[in-house]
Amino acid sequence: MFNTLGTVLDPKKSKAKYPEARVIVLDDSFNTFQHVANCLLTIIPSMSEKRAWDLTIKIDKTGSAEVWRGNLEQAELYHEQLFSKGLTMAPIEKT
């Protein structure tokens, strides 16, 4: 039977899923540990000093580290800001 008042959408089906992304910093031979850690501290919200240093060490040891994950728009902003400070960045990875 047709509902003349309109169709009610199922909220579970109608919610748009916003794309998420990962921000990854790559190791390089020219940025110092201090510079990388400072960039992470000043650009990534809620980044603690300990976490910034842990990520910096991981970048050095493994070649890269995911420094932030979340909605694509924010990921693009953090990626651009870190890149503008001279960090070597992997392309944004959509998840």
Regions flagged by a language model, labelled:
Residues 1-95:
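Terminal domain-initiation and capping elements
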